[in-house]
Amino acid sequence: MAEFHASRDPYATAPYGVSWAGEEKSANWFDSAREFTERWHHQQQIRLAVDKPGIMTRELYYPVLDCFLRALPFTYRKVSTKPGTYAHIIVSGECGDSWYLYRAEESWQLVEEPIGEKISETTIPQEIAWRIFTKGIDRESALSQTKVTGDTKLGQHVLGMISIVA
C-alpha cells in the first residue's frame, strides 16, 4: 500500500475527491492522507474497544488531525459571520496544534496564521478530537470536555464536523 501511494504524483488529480472536505477533485497527496486517516482511526477504534494502548504519537496522530481539520471550510460553509474574522480551533496535547479558520467575503478559508479579529476559540482535548471527527462520541460528551470562548455557537459548530465518509 505504501508503495502505491509513494508511486503517485502527489499533485496530480486523484481518482476520487475527498468528499468530506467538499472537494469533487482532490490532489493525490490529499487522497493518500485521507486513506491514512481511515486506517489510523480504524486501528484506534479497535484499540479503544479492546482497552489496548492507542497510537496517539505526534508522528502518527498529528497528520491525522491536520487532514481531518481540512474539512473546516466545508463544515462552516453555511455559517455566516462578519468577513475579516476568524475562529481559532485548538487541539490540546502533545499531538495537537492550532488551526485558523478565516471568514473572507464569500467563504471560509483555512489559513496558517490568524488574520483579522478572533471571534471564537475552541479547545478540544486530543484524546477526543479524533472521536468527534469520526462520529465516535456524542455531542453532549464532547461539549462537556471542550472549552469555547467568544461566539459559542460558532465555536461549537466544529463539534459537528465529520472527516470521514459516513
Language-model-detected regions and their locations in the chain:
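Hydrophobic pocket/interface hotspot
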Residues: 1, 42, 146
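Acidic interhelical loop/turn segments
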Residues: 2-32
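C-terminal interaction segments
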Residues: 7, 114-166
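Short, contiguous alpha-helical
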Residues: 21-77
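A short, structural micro-pattern
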Residues: 33, 40, 81-83, 95, ...
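Short alpha-helical "patches" and their helix-cap loops
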Residues: 49-64, 82, 86, 141-153
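A glycine-rich beta-turn/hairpin centered on an aromatic-Pro dipeptide
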Residues: 63-104
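Acidic/His-leaning functional-site neighborhoods
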Residues: 96-121, 125
